[in-house]
A protein has these predicted regions:
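Surface-exposed loop/turn segments flanking beta-strands in extracellular/periplasmic regions
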Residues: 273-310, 407-447, 499-530, 560, ...
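Residues on the lipid-exposed face of transmembrane beta-strands in outer-membrane beta-barrel proteins
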Residues: 185, 242, 254, 330-336, ...
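Surface-exposed, low-complexity/disordered Ser/Thr/Gly/Pro/Asn-rich loops and linkers
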Residues: 451-454
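Short, small/polar-rich motifs associated with maturation and membrane association
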Residues: 1-372, 386-387
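Flexible loop and strand-edge segments within Gram-negative outer membrane beta-barrel domains
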Residues: 263, 307-346, 350-353, 363-446, ...
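Small-side-chain secondary-structure face that scaffolds active or pore-lining regions
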Residues: 348-369, 399-401, 461-467, 476-583, ...
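Membrane-embedded beta-strand positions of outer-membrane beta-barrel proteins
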Residues: 252-256, 343, 388, 470, ...
């Protein structure tokens, strides 16, 4: 078989060293160990890789098994590799079955075509293409690889799965922990992210898709692969294909997983005693008087007065040691020779790490999502297929109300002084006082507490998304063999409700030392209920496409062609909500391959 595709490679020689240590114990005496360095004799092995017809295979990989020592064949199918005689070599090339051989001089390796690999197809823009005929830079991953780890967002498991793809996770907040994806870096068109398509239709994000619904994900990386998308594909394209039913008996699958989420590492904070000593040393170094008296430092040291002179580790006080995450999915697939179906329902929950205390509303970050999907294919006639894709999700997230977000809460927690507050005592939020107590002791300052989110209210967001696709595929072999026509229509909508509880207040207290040595509290402010408000938002878009596809083989020659028209409009509740925006496109593609 004549193959003219080749890749320039680099031989990576690796020297192998073995150290043998011999120990000879006898009657309680042990001789000194002797280290002997043995260098295996290596030589340059020359060989040729050909196909079953004796034609040289250009660019075949030759790798010494168990090492990174490898090379590729040149334009004549010849390779040279530095290994020892008798070493095992693995020879491989796309479209052929891998072969393991023993290294010897002037060897000849015959690779046999892998019919399965030659017929394997890859998802590409607006269609599929045989892997063996592809020239663009495309990487893919199967759906089963995505479900090995329980994650809420598909983007969090893609990192390391495909070359050229980088993911960065900026937050661990439940419901907002999706990783940002970069394909071969990042282009600069409006600071855009990669284009995401699910079953051929643009989607805003992949973070709300259940991984159990996915058949495969393909990443289009270079210009030749993304050209048909124009400027929209400047940062790469992610093509997600969902599962579909196949003819046969119904298959029921149920998966469930539970995980324990814990902070990976928390910064250890100084105790009140250490804080006071270090602060006094700092003041002394600057030629100033110490602020913390010996009496206060002694109180910090012995912990005898934890309300007036507290020592609190804010990370331990306001954060839980762990929380739970769970993921469940039930799906059924099957069909007859006329109708095929895939039906899926999934649920995902992720708890928060912030303590909720005793308020009537939730103060912790939490996220819950329910996914559903139905993919239905019906053969209306022998040449006509009608398909329906109905999917969506309902998700809810809870957050404590703060102007600084979750990162601000963490920052305040670490900035808080360990003696600023003893926390909540008998249902009261107690703050330390910098007034002089009746025994003459006084805190020079109190600093901020880590309880900034306590009593500030909450925010609950609920989002309901619906996606409906209708596809009609008509074979037109009556005109010419290999010709087909497809029309697709899609409607997508989302509705968001944001419930906010704000405007309430929490009374705070400071300790007072009574004459009898007991502790009383001075009250500041009053407890008032939060006021509730609701805001809603909606977005919708529609998409349509019509295309002619041609795929035909003439002997050793295969020709494919695509001509497609598509149009999309998006409506958002912005300032100019009556003015939609969208695009209209014409796409053409022709491919040819020989053998």
């Amino acid at each position: 078989m004549n193959k003219k595709n080749f890749i320039k490679g680099t031989t990576l020689p690796v020297a192998l060293f073995f150290t043998i240590a011999t120990f000879a114990p006898a009657w309680g005496l042990q001789t000194a160990s002797a280290a002997i360095e043995v260098v295996q004799q290596q030589s340059t092995i020359k060989g040729t890789v050909v196909d079953s017809q004796g034609e040289p295979i250009i660019g075949a990989s030759v790798l010494a098994e168990g090492t990174s020592n490898g090379t590729i064949t040149d334009i004549d199918g010849v390779f040279r590799i530095n290994v020892r005689l008798g070493a095992k070599l693995k020879v491989s090339f796309i479209g052929y079955t891998d072969k393991k051989v023993v290294a010897k001089n002037d060897m000849k390796v015959i690779l046999v075509e892998d019919v399965t690999a030659l017929e394997e197809v890859e998802i590409v823009a607006y269609g599929t293409q045989k892997k063996v005929t592809m020239t663009g830079a495309i990487a893919s991953v199967k759906g089963e690889e995505l479900t090995r780890v329980s994650v809420g967002s598909v983007s969090n498991v893609l990192g390391g799965q495909m070359t050229g793809l980088t993911t960065v996770q900026y937050s661990g907040e439940p419901g907002a922990d999706a990783a940002e994806i970069f394909i071969r870096g990042k282009a600069t068109w409006e600071n855009s992210s990669p284009l995401i398509q699910v079953d051929g239709v643009d989607r805003e994000s992949m973070s709300d898709i259940d991984p159990n619904e996915i058949e495969s994900i393909s990443i289009l990386k270079d210009a030749s692969a993304t050209a048909v998308f124009g400027i929209r594909g400047a940062n790469g394209v992610i093509l997600i294909t969902t599962k579909r039913g196949k003819e046969g008996k119904a298959k029921i699958s149920f998966t469930t997983s539970a995980s324990v989420l814990m902070p990976t590492k928390m910064v250890e904070q100084a105790s009140s005693y250490d804080y006071a000593r270090f602060h006094n040393q700092m003041m002394s170094g600057d030629g100033k008087s110490a602020l913390f008296s010996d009496g206060v430092i002694q109180k910090f040291a012995d912990g005898s007065d934890p309300i007036r002179f507290p020592n609190i580790q804010w990370a331990d006080y306001i954060m839980k040691s762990s929380t739970l995450q769970s993921q469940h999915n039930l799906n059924i697939s099957g069909g007859t020779d006329k109708v095929r179906y895939f039906i899926s329902a999934g649920a995902y929950t992720q708890g928060g790490l912030f303590s909720e205390f005793d308020l009537p509303y939730n103060l912790s970050y939490q996220y819950r999502r329910f996914n559903y999907r139905t993919n239905l294919d019906m053969d209306v006639t022998k040449t006509t297929t009608l398909s329906f894709n109905i999917s969506g999700n309902v998700n809810n997230s809870d957050q404590p109300r703060t102007s600084q977000g979750s990162s601000g809460l963490i920052k305040n927690m670490y900035y808080a002084t360990p003696f600023s507050s003893p926390g909540i005592i008998d249902g009261k939020l107690v703050n330390s006082s910098d007034e002089t107590y009746s025994d003459g002791l006084k805190l020079p300052f109190t600093g901020g507490t880590g309880m900034g989110y306590y009593g500030n209210g909450f925010s609950q967001t609920s989002n309901n998304s619906l996606n409906v696709d209708v596809i009609l595929d008509q074979k037109m072999d009556f005109l010419t063999k290999g010709l087909s026509f497809k029309v697709k229509g899609s409607y997508n909508s989302s509705f968001t409700v944001n419930k906010v509880g704000s405007g309430g207040s929490i009374a705070t207290y400071t300790p007072v030392l009574m004459d009898d040595g007991s502790i009383a509290y001075r009250k500041f402010g009053e407890n008032t209920d939060v006021k509730y408000s609701y805001t809603t938002g909606k977005a919708r878009n529609w998409y349509m496409e019509a295309s002619f596809n041609y795929n035909r083989t003439f002997g050793d020659h295969t020709v494919t062609a695509l001509f497609l028209y598509n149009q999309q409009k998006e409506y958002y509740p912005k300032v100019y909500s009556d003015i939609p925006h969208g695009y209209v496109g014409l796409v053409g593609r022709v491919t040819y391959d020989w053998k």
